[in-house]
Amino acid sequence: MSDLNSTGNEARTDLEIFSWGYDERLSWLGAAWECADNGHYYELPVNQEDLIGLLRAGVHHSSALHCKLNVLTSTFEPTALLSRAEFKKLAFNFLVTGNGYLSAERNRFGKVLGFKNRLSVYMRRSSKKYEKDGYFYLRSHVIATADFIPKSDVIHLMQPDLVQEVYGIPDYLAGLSSAELNRSATTFRRRYYDNGSHAGFIVYATDNNINNDDWNNLKDQFKKAQREGNFRNVFLRSPDGKSDGIKLIPISEVAAKDDFLNIKNVSAQDMLTIHRVPPSLMGVVPTAAGGLGDARTAAEVFAANEIEPIQAAFLEANDAFGAEVFRFKPYTLATVGK
């Protein structure tokens, strides 16, 4: 039996089988070492930077959180220990990251004068291996520059988790895939539009009458056909060429019938569902003839089912601290006079 490589005819592989891979674990879910003890503090179970990034990219996701924040802030009554401005910062951190932190400010005699919000992204719970019980406020990723705050000076509000009780996690994690999908659909459409309303193509040329200089000029023109060059015309002259000497083979067609609108609508509905905020309170434009229903009724139900439980979570801190830090008034809608 002769060897194929010894005949001078190189063996060619014309068939290649590949796959797109398996589902990858999204970074915002954390890793197998959730709340790992590094000797100083416990690591966070959820990537905080990813949560903030999605807040700035997801339209409905951001709108729902800000709607809750505005209603909560409107019902808060400033106390001797907490101002409205500090409460708004605290509530925003609590809604987005699942954690809210207040640190006490004391006078020289140790009396608490008030509370200031601490950004939850930089707060870490000290581990049992550390000699003191409290929290680290990380100014950077270097532990040497962190501020240590005793536990007695911190009010930690957190949304509950099923696997750990060190940190809270936001209750909307199940909807982050939809927020990612919504953002990806918008990003793809924007890049598709900037690219000249095409997703790329292959230039297949068999015309030998075009020299290398002309080919280089043609390539330069194709490279410039983006953004402001979308409507640029390309003139190519080949007197003895064939009609099919140059072909444009689209890599993928993205026509008006693509699923962009369906993806946007379905993912938006998912985000509204996970946040349980009525669309009429978020500025959503109705598409059905019946509209979005009575906004006043929706606001009253929303306040009873969503806002009051959050208020109750804040009020529990009053009992834990032994003083009135939080105070709320009932949520009411203004009546427009005739």
Name each region found by the language model.
Residues 3-8, 139-278, 282-292, 301-338:
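Extended, charged amphipathic alpha-helical segments
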Residues 1-125, 166-169, 254, 291, ...:
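Flexible, gly/proline-biased loop segments at the beginnings
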Residues 112-128, 147-160:
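Structured surface patches comprising rigid loops and adjacent beta-strands/short helices at the edges
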Residues 109-118, 128-140, 244-250:
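Short, well-ordered strand-loop elements centered on a beta-strand within folded domains, enriched
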